């Protein structure tokens, strides 16, 4: 959740 959006299984937002 670097962008503060929904966290995925990768730990980052879906926009990334």
Swiss-Prot record:
Its main location: secreted. The keyword Aminoacyl-tRNA synthetase does not apply. The keyword Nuclease does not apply. Expressed by the venom gland. GO terms for cellular component: extracellular space. Keywords: Bradykinin receptor impairing toxin, G-protein coupled receptor impairing toxin, Secreted, Toxin. One of its GO terms (molecular function) is toxin activity. It is found in: Secreted. Belongs to the bradykinin-related peptide family. Inhibits angiotensin-converting enzyme (ACE) with a Ki of 61.8 uM, and targets B1 bradykinin receptors (BDKRB1). In vivo, induces hyperalgesic effects in living rats after intraplantar injection. Is hydrolyzed by angiotensin-converting enzyme (ACE) by only 6.7% (compared to bradykinin). This is Bradykinin-related peptide Cd-146. It comes from Cyphononyx dorsalis (Spider wasp).
């Amino acid at each position: 959740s670097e962008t503060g959006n929904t966290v995925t299984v990768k730990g980052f937002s879906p926009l990334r």
